Regions:
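Bacterial N-terminal signal peptides that target proteins for export
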Residues: 1-11
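Bacterial N-terminal signal peptides
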Residues: 10-21
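Active-site neighborhoods and metal-handling regions in enzymes and metal-associated proteins
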Residues: 25-474
Length: 474
């Protein structure tokens, strides 16, 4: 057994060996992680970038959306660890949870006079918590407390917060008060029962009569993305492509030895090693000639068709990607023509989807158009695409679900807006002659951008050819 002294000495040595940043100087000690292993910079770099994005979003998107949806004052109360889904879209990257109770208040002071929307139209108040890097005006308690270093004041607490909210509303006299309540969208249903009750009791009938479900306001604020975020998202997508191409290669796969679970954990480990996150457990699927069910965690063999569903999370943004690969048999240099034709059918569906997704259209309208055109081309497939951004399955219209191809009531009725991102997720099933007519499913997913101008483009590109895995391994 190691002695306590030796254990302390060893621990000290390990701590000294850790990467160190010189406090307040932005300089990194020589033994820090190489920049090549930090594809998106340091945490400090990312936080500064996210803070700029936050201010830009609140200065640009929020005033326009409040006016568009007729919300004079939007109130967003929440308690620690029971945050509203809009929380991550309105707070600093240095804030991880609400502080005790936090009430965010947004007031369109230009609405009453119908003045043009500008970045200065919306007042932003934080009744509790911090200014979120200077983007909110904060209010503190007037309760006396024992002297604190630096003259620190008491924090707002209990009924005092509700009364301060009431005073703020009475001063501003809004005609419409938006609250986050919805039976349709989880993203716009963030007002808890307890907070609604407490707020209603404090405000009284005069002001609660002006409550209106904000619904589309938080939904579209969460969904709206800046051009600067688009550029960063493209870099994220580039990295995902690099990783899927490496995973689906003989650098990682040894045909006849590697199991699908090995690839799952290769992905998880590689994501972690680069300081990234993910929002779901990756999956790997195998289709094999003459085999209906390859079983759980099969060994990957020559001739297999491989499919992955993977994603990464960086700076509160998420990707969602599905790629396809073929494991070459001995003597093969390419995939069979039938498999390439099957992938081409999925590509044709992607082309249709990109043409049909336009601002102002609902998810259900887009789904119907895509499926009608797909069937006219003789393609057997399904579409189940979704918004992406601050959440993997993001705010906005669903374009089908895998088991609801006739449309998605409610969630499919939301409309596409400019500056929104989607994951175009779909599959085409095609008989393959080289496999004796066996149907092969080509499931693809690529992230795309609806620009501020309403035009669509891939975040990076889409997969036009199968990744090829050499079967001999390395």
């Amino acid at each position: 057994m190691t002695s306590p002294l030796l254990r302390r000495t060893t621990l000290a040595a390990l701590l000294l060996a850790l990467p160190m940043t010189l406090h307040g100087q932005g300089r990194t000690a020589p033994n820090a992680l190489p920049a090549a292993e930090r594809p998106f910079g340091t945490m400090r770099d990312q936080a500064a970038m996210q803070q700029r994005w936050l201010k830009q979003r609140l200065d640009t998107f929020l005033p326009a959306l409040m006016r568009k949806h007729g919300i004079d004052l939007w109130v967003v109360p929440m308690r620690e660890y029971n945050e509203d889904p809009v929380f991550s879209s309105i707070v600093s990257p240095e804030t991880f949870a609400a502080r005790r109770r936090t009430i965010y208040v947004f007031f369109d002071k230009c609405a009453a006079t119908k003045a043009p929307v500008t970045s200065t139209c919306v007042e932003r108040l934080a009744l509790g918590g911090t200014s979120q890097g200077g983007v909110f005006e904060t209010k503190s308690s007037t309760r006396p407390v024992a002297a604190q270093p630096g003259g620190r004041q008491a924090e707002l607490w209990g009924d005092e917060q509700w009364q301060l909210l009431k005073a703020a509303i009475e001063d501003r006299k809004p005609s419409v008060i938006g609250i986050d309540r919805s039976k349709t969208f989880a993203f716009t249903d963030g007002l808890s029962s307890g907070e609604l009750q407490g707020m209603s009791e404090a405000l009284g009938a005069t002001w609660t009569a002006k409550f209106r479900d904000a619904e589309a306001l938080p939904l579209e604020l969460i969904a709206s993305r800046l051009p600067e975020e688009e550029a960063f998202f493209t870099k994220m997508t580039e990295l995902v492509w690099q990783m899927t191409q490496t995973m689906f290669s003989d650098k990682v796969i040894v045909a006849g030895q590697t199991r699908t679970s090995d690839l799952v954990w290769w992905w998880r480990q590689r994501v972690n090693d680069q300081g990234l996150g993910t929002w779901f457990q990756p999956s790997i699927e195998v289709q094999r000639q003459g085999v209906a069910d390859v079983g759980e965690d099969p060994v990957i063999m020559p001739g297999d068709v491989l499919h992955c569903d993977v994603g990464i999370t960086v700076a509160r943004l998420n990707t969602d990607t599905q790629h396809m690969a073929y494991v070459l048999k001995a003597g093969e240099t390419d995939a069979p023509a039938g498999l390439k034709a099957a992938l081409a059918n999925a590509n044709a569906m992607q082309d249709i989807a990109m043409e049909e997704i336009k601002p102002g259209r609902t998810g259900n309208e887009i789904l119907k158009s895509v499926l009608d055109r797909m069937k006219a081309k003789g393609i057997n497939g399904t579409m189940y695409s979704h918004p992406i951004g601050m959440h993997g399955h993001g705010a906005g219209p669903l374009i089908g679900l895998w088991d609801l191809q006739g449309g998605v009531p409610g969630r499919g009725d939301a409309k596409v807006i400019p500056s929104m991102w989607f994951s175009i997720e779909l599959q085409a099933t095609t008989p393959v002659a080289e496999w004796g007519g066996q149907a092969v499913r080509m499931a693809q997913e690529e992230d795309m951008i609806v620009g501020a101008d309403g035009k669509t483009r891939w975040s990076l590109k889409r997969q036009n050819s199968l990744f090829l895995v050499k079967s001999q391994g390395k």
